[in-house]
UniProtKB/Swiss-Prot annotation:
Reactions that this protein is recorded to catalyse: (2R)-2-phosphoglycerate = phosphoenolpyruvate + H2O
SMART domains per the UniProt record, alphabetical: Enolase_C, Enolase_N
Subcellular localization: Cytoplasm; Secreted; Cell surface
SUPFAM superfamilies: Enolase C-terminal domain-like (SSF51604), Enolase N-terminal domain-like (SSF54826)
Molecular functions (GO terms): magnesium ion binding; phosphopyruvate hydratase activity
Protein name per UniProt: Enolase
GO biological process, one term: glycolytic process
Binding-site residues for Mg(2+), renumbered to this chain: D246, E291, D318
Pathway: Carbohydrate degradation; glycolysis; pyruvate from D-glyceraldehyde 3-phosphate: step 4/5
CDD domains linked to this entry: enolase
Keywords of the record: Cytoplasm, Glycolysis, Lyase, Magnesium, Metal-binding, Secreted
The protein's enzyme class: lyase
Length: 432
C-alpha cells in the first residue's frame, strides 16, 4: 500500500514572482504528499542545476515547463510501483535516471520537488509527523530539537535594492527558553527596528527575505542600528541577543583584481584584510556567526579566516560547500570553516541532504538549515531542522508569509512535542 501510484507536477509561483516546480506524490493507500522547490538569488557555482526553459517570450525565460515535463513523463514512469518508505531508493532512481553530475538533465528543482513530496507521502502513510519520519530516515528516531532562529532583519547585497554590500544582518534570540519565546523576541526587535529606521527618515521597505533594506553609510551602520533596535525592544545585546551575518562575499569579489570591493562604502580589501575587517566587527559587536565571509573559491583565504576567528565564531560555508559531501569533506580535511549551511536545492534530494548533515555533525561541524531567497509556502525545512536536531535555522525575517510559514510550522511542532520540546539556544552555535 506504500507504493507510488501517481506523480503530478505543475508550475507555480515563488515569492519573487518567478515560476518554480511543485510535485504531488500519491500512494496506492491514498496517502499523499506535496512539495515545492525553492530558488536562490546569490548562488554557488557548484550547486546542482536549476532547470529553466530559456524561452524569453514566457516568464522572461524563467519558466519551468521542462522540469515539470520531466516529472510527469520520465520520473513518474520510473517511480510508479516503488515504495515511498524507501527514500534512499526513490532518490537514487532519480539520480541514476538523470545521469549527470549536477542533475542538469531533469533539473534539481524537479528532482527535489519529488523527493520531498515522496517523504511527505511516506509520513502520511505511516501516520506520523514529517519531522518524525525525517528522524527515522536520519537514523535518529525520537531525537528532536527546536532550532535557534537566525532572523534576517536587514537585507543587502543581492537580496535588496540598496547600497549595503553585506547580504544579511541577523539577530539570534539566545536568551529565550523556548522557540516560541525566541520568535516573540525576534518579532519585537523587528518592529522596534522599523520605528528606529522611520525616526531616522530611512526606508522601511523590505527585501526578498522580509528584512528592511535601507541605504546606510556603511555595513557597520547596519549593526549599529540593530543594536539600537535591540535595546529599544528591551533586550541586552550580547546577553539576550547575539548577531550573525551572511556576507555572500562572492557577490562583491573582483576575481580579476583579487579584491573584495565594498562599493557601498568605497572600501577595498584583500582576502586577509577582509577577514581582519570582520574580526574587528566581531570585537565591536557580539557577532557569533559569519556565513560566506569570502569568495567560494578562496580556500586559502578561508583557511586564514577560520584560523583567525574559528575558535570563537561560527564560520559557515554556503556557496563554499553547497550542501555537497564531496566539497564538505575537503573542507573538513583542510580545516576550512566549522559549519555548513544546508539548502535542499543545492544538492537536489532529501537523502543527499541528510548525508551532508551527518558528515558535518560527525566532524564536529554545525549544520544550519536554510531557506532560499525565492521561497514558497512549503515549510519542509522546519521539519528538517527538528527531525535532524540541527539546532539552527535561517528562514528570513518576521514578515512575508513565505518566511513566516516556516516559523509557524515550528510553533506547531513545539506544541505537538509539548514537554519533550528541546530548545538549546546559544549552545547550538559553534564556538559558543
Amino acid at each position: 500500500m506504500s507504493k507510488i501510484s501517481k506523480i503530478l507536477a505543475r508550475e507555480i509561483m515563488d515569492s519573487r514572482g518567478n515560476p518554480t516546480v511543485e510535485a504531488d506524490v500519491y500512494l496506492e493507500s491514498g496517502a499523499f504528499g506535496r512539495a515545492a522547490a525553492p530558488s536562490g538569488a546569490s548562488t554557488g557555482s557548484r550547486e546542482a542545476l536549476e532547470l529553466r526553459d530559456g524561452d524569453k517570450a514566457r516568464y522572461l525565460g524563467k519558466g519551468v515547463l521542462k522540469a515539470v515535463a520531466a516529472i510527469n513523463v520520465n520520473i513518474q514512469a520510473a517511480l510508479i510501483g516503488q515504495s515511498a518508505l524507501d527514500q534512499a531508493n526513490i532518490d537514487q532512481i532519480m539520480i541514476d535516471l538523470d545521469g549527470t553530475e549536477n542533475k542538469e538533465q531533469f533539473g534539481a528543482n524537479a528532482i527535489l520537488a519529488v523527493s520531498l513530496a515522496n517523504a511527505k507521502a511516506a509520513a502520511n502513510e505511516k501516520k506520523v509527523q514529517l519531522f518524525e519520519h525525517i528522524a527515522d530516515l536520519n537514523g535518529t528516531p525520537g531525537v528532536y530539537s527546536l532550532p535557534l532562529p537566525m532572523m534576517n532583519i536587514i537585507n543587502g547585497g543581492e537580496h535588496a535594492d540598496n547600497n549595503v554590500d553585506i547580504q544579511e544582518f541577523m539577530v539570534q534570540p539566545v536568551g529565550a527558553k523556548s522557540f516560541r519565546e525566541a520568535l516573540r523576541m525576534g518579532a519585537e526587535i523587528f518592529h522596534a527596528l522599523k520605528k528606529v529606521l522611520s525616526s531616522k527618515g530611512m526606508s522601511t521597505s523590505v527585501g526578498d527575505e522580509g528584512g528592511f533594506a535601507p541605504n546606510l553609510e556603511s555595513n557597520a551602520d547596519a549593526l549599529a542600528v540593530i543594536k539600537v533596535a535591540v535595546e529599544a525592544a528591551g533586550y541586552e545585546l550580547g546577553k539576550d541577543v547575539t548577531l550573525a551575518m551572511d556576507c555572500a562575499a562572492s557577490e562583491f569579489y573582483d576575481a580579476d583584481k583579487g579584491i573584495y570591493d565594498l562599493t557601498g562604502e568605497g572600501k577595498q580589501f584583500t582576502a586577509n584584510e577582509f577577514s581582519d575587517f570582520l574580526g574587528e566587527l566581531c570585537k565591536e559587536y557580539p557577532i557569533v556567526s559569519i556565513e560566506d565571509g569570502l569568495d567560494e573559491s578562496d580556500w586559502d583565504g578561508f583557511k586564514y579566516q577560520t584560523d583567525l576567528l574559528g575558535d570563537k565564531v561560527q564560520i559557515v560555508g554556503d556557496d563554499l560547500f553547497v550542501t555537497n559531501t564531496k566539497i564538505l569533506a575537503r573542507g573538513i580535511e583542510n580545516g576550512i570553516g566549522n559549519s555548513i549551511l544546508i539548502k535542499f536545492n543545492q544538492i537536489g534530494t532529501l537523502t543527499e541532504t541528510l548525508a551532508a548533515i551527518k558528515m558535518a555533525k560527525d566532524a564536529g561541524f554545525t549544520a544550519v538549515i536554510s531557506h532560499r531567497s525565492g521561497e514558497t509556502e512549503d515549510a519542509t525545512i522546519a521539519d528538517l531542522a527538528v527531525g535532524t536536531a540541527a539546532g539552527q535555522i535561517k528562514t528570513g525575517s518576521l514578515c512575508r508569509s513565505d518566511r513566516v510559514s516556516k516559523y509557524n510550522q515550528l510553533l506547531r511542532i513545539e506544541e505537538f512535542l509539548g514537554d519533550k520540546a528541546i530548545f538549546n539556544g546559544l549552545s547550538e552555535v559553534k564556538g559558543q
